[in-house]
């Protein structure tokens, strides 16, 4: 019973994470006004980043380089969307994200923007 409960909990967390990531993709598509090509390299990079971002949040691991100021200055629209997504994701996964995650997420969002244009 205990093993089953632990397994069920992991499945629940995985489903919750997948749902949260899908909501984030929807937010990006709404912001760009275009669907994201799920076969693109930018999409795959974004998905991998989000998966590891959630994993880092659950373990407390932090990124070494802060890109927030640069991304905010150079790509304010992508940074705004990244900020909104990070807030949404924190609520969905029940963990706080380190503030440096916003800049890295903005970088991936900007790549998706570039592909969507």
Regions found by a protein language model. Name each.
Residues 1-117:
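A cross-family "folded-core" feature that marks the main globular domain of proteins
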């Amino acid at each position: 019973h205990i093993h089953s409960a632990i397994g069920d909990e992991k499945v629940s967390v995985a489903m919750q994470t997948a749902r949260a990531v899908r909501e984030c993709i929807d937010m990006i598509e709404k912001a760009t006004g275009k669907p994201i090509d799920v076969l693109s390299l930018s999409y795959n990079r974004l998905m991998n980043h989000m998966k590891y971002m959630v994993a880092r949040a659950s373990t407390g691991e932090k990124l070494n380089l802060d890109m927030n100021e640069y991304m905010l200055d150079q790509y304010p629209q992508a940074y705004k969307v990244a900020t909104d997504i990070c807030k949404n994701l924190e609520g969905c996964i029940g963990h706080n994200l380190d503030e440096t995650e916003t800049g890295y997420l903005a970088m991936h969002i900007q790549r998706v923007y570039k592909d969507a244009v």
